[in-house]
Amino acid sequence: IWPRKIYKTNCQGNYKTKKSKKIKSTFDLVRIIEKTVPKKFQMGSIHCATRTFQALRIAVNKELDNLKEFLPQAFGMLAPKGRLVVISFHSLEDRVVKNFFKDIFEKGVVKILTKKPITADTNEVLANPKSRSAKLRAVIKS
């Protein structure tokens, strides 16, 4: 929903003048996002532009592609009874890890040590707010 609204707000420009505005800085992008996202979704401790910048970072750094390439390599280096433990910080990463672990489990080459991901408890999140989205998954090679 938001990408379409951001496009309409910025790329299509003002409907009366038909001028498109150039984004010259991250502050310009934040301003556009703040104008686009309804106020009721701007409440809370996480800024409404956070996910947009996260999506840009993930795409530019090819984080999901790198993770998909890394996991089989890391698993291939494990000795028998070796453990592969992965911490993910957002749902897209977690889905890649979960699916990889599921695939190798179905091949019978690992035992899953964490049926559900381990997440930070309330005390940890209070002490370390960045841990709120962390999910730990682990397998042991047969």
Question: Which positions does each model-derived feature cover?
Answer:
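S-adenosyl-L-methionine-dependent methyltransferase catalytic core, i.e., the SAM/SAH-binding region
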Residues: I1-S142
